[in-house]
Amino acid sequence: MKQTVLLLFTALFLSGCSVASADDSVPRFTEEGKYIGSADPHTIAVSLNGEETMIQVPKDKRDECESLPDQTHVLVKYTKKDNGTLQLEDIQLRKNS
């Protein structure tokens, strides 16, 4: 009986190990663009491929974004959620070219 319970528990435990998290299926992008500035405390505007794009900024990245000068070249890494919202993962200042 103990072996059966242990076997079932182990099978149940291991079945959860292969479940992909929601973040694994979210499309990720890395693009160069021009940082336009903050739209509000949690959104930045970046020109990507000549089009102004709004990207949501998580709390841990807000200070980093606020320190960027407007109209500077940046490399942005972001995800696109199912509802179309873009979420910033990283932003790096690039030399103007």
Swiss-Prot record:
Signal peptide (residue range): 1-16
Whether Signal counts among this entry's keywords is: yes
Kindly state which keywords UniProt assigns to this record, in alphabetical order: Cell membrane, Lipoprotein, Membrane, Palmitate, Signal
Q: Where is the lipid attached (S-diacylglycerol cysteine)?
A: 17
Q: Which cysteines are joined by disulfide bonds?
A: none
Which residues are covalently lipidated (N-palmitoyl cysteine)? Answer: 17
Does the record carry Signal as a key word?
A: yes
- Topology in membrane: Lipid-anchor
Q: What superkingdom does the record give?
A: Bacteria
Report the locations given in the UniProt record: Cell membrane
Cellular component annotations (GO), alphabetically ordered = plasma membrane
Q: What is this protein called?
A: Uncharacterized lipoprotein YqiH
> In which organism is this protein found?
Bacillus subtilis (strain 168)
Its taxonomic path starts at: Bacteria, Bacillati, Bacillota, Bacilli, Bacillales
